Structures are given as C-alpha cells and as structure tokens.
Amino acid sequence: MNTMNSVLECKELALYGGSFDPLHKAHLAIIEQTLELLPFVQLIVLPAYQNPFKKPCFLDAKTRFKELERALKGMPRVLLSDFEIKQERAVPTIESVLHFQKLYRPKTLYLVIGADCLRHLSSWTNAKELLKRVELVVFERIGYEEIQFKGRYHPLKGIDAPISSSAIRASLGV
C-alpha cells in the first residue's frame, strides 16, 4: 500500500468502495484487474461504514478495515482510506467523490463498481452529477445478466471468483 504523498502526485485516481463484509478473493481480483486495466492509476479502496442499499454489516467497520489493511499490505498503487468509516454513517458515493476530487484534484477520477450496481445507479444520490464527475469501471458479476447501460464505461471482464459477500454470510447462517 502506498502513502498519501504518492497519491498527491497522481493524475489518475480510482475509487473502489464497498462493504467488504467479508473481504474475499473476488474483491482482490477486482483490485488487481483495475490496476492492470488502468496502468497509471492510483487506486483508493474505500470501505463503507454502512452501505445505504444494504442491511447493517455483519462485521464491524474496524474489523473490515483491518482485514483490508492486511490483504492490501505491500500492494503498489493501492491506498486504503477510512474516510467513509470515520463518518459513522452511510455516505453517498457523490460525497466521497467530491471529497477525493477536492483533496487530490486528479485529472481523471474512475469509479469501480459491479455490473449489478448499474441496475439502480439512477437511484443513487445525485446520480447525474456523479456521472459527470467520474468515469465508470464496471466489473462483471457471475450470475447477473448483462445490463444495458447507455453511458460510457470501461469493462472489467473475467473475474473468475464467483463468491459474493452475501453468499458467504448466507453459508454462515447470518
């Protein structure tokens, strides 16, 4: 993982937010493939305190952050941020985007999301403003049909790990 200073020098920034509840190998594959797709980008991994579209998290924010910290240690061009966790509330994506745009002033800001999120993107807080401010990087989700999206995006294909956090929690009876 890099320091904040290395982010300051970056012209391309990507945000990958999520609950990471729990963290699994598909999350890590998405990070690796984003870095391959965008070779000059600095990637900020942004665990949510609470996803506004989901039930409260199974694992507390501190535990999820520590899991990510261990998993991302030594990964070049990756920074773990506790911005949303520190808010202690559900943070709309546009708020995080505005925060990181103000903080780092990147020329390009990418937002990494799952294809399943495209289905309800229009219901996100200030969705139109969000789409003006970011370029989407969309990863396919196994088990989800291909979604027709009229906007421009960078596809991430071949995430071979079909495991979802929801499936892991269900297998644990949670």
UniProtKB/Swiss-Prot annotation:
Its EC number is 2.7.7.18. GO terms for molecular function: ATP binding; nicotinate-nucleotide adenylyltransferase activity. Pathway: Cofactor biosynthesis; NAD(+) biosynthesis; deamido-NAD(+) from nicotinate D-ribonucleotide: step 1/1. GO terms for biological process: NAD biosynthetic process. CDD domains: NMNAT. Gene3D superfamilies: HUPs (3.40.50.620). It catalyses: nicotinate beta-D-ribonucleotide + ATP + H(+) = deamido-NAD(+) + diphosphate. It comes from the Bacteria. It is an enzyme of class 2 (transferase). The keyword Repeat does not apply. Pfam families: CTP_transf_like (PF01467). Keywords: ATP-binding, NAD, Nucleotide-binding, Nucleotidyltransferase, Pyridine nucleotide biosynthesis, Transferase. Catalyzes the reversible adenylation of nicotinate mononucleotide (NaMN) to nicotinic acid adenine dinucleotide (NaAD). Belongs to the NadD family. This is Probable nicotinate-nucleotide adenylyltransferase. It comes from Helicobacter pylori (strain J99 / ATCC 700824). The lineage of its organism: Bacteria, Pseudomonadati, Campylobacterota, Epsilonproteobacteria, Campylobacterales.
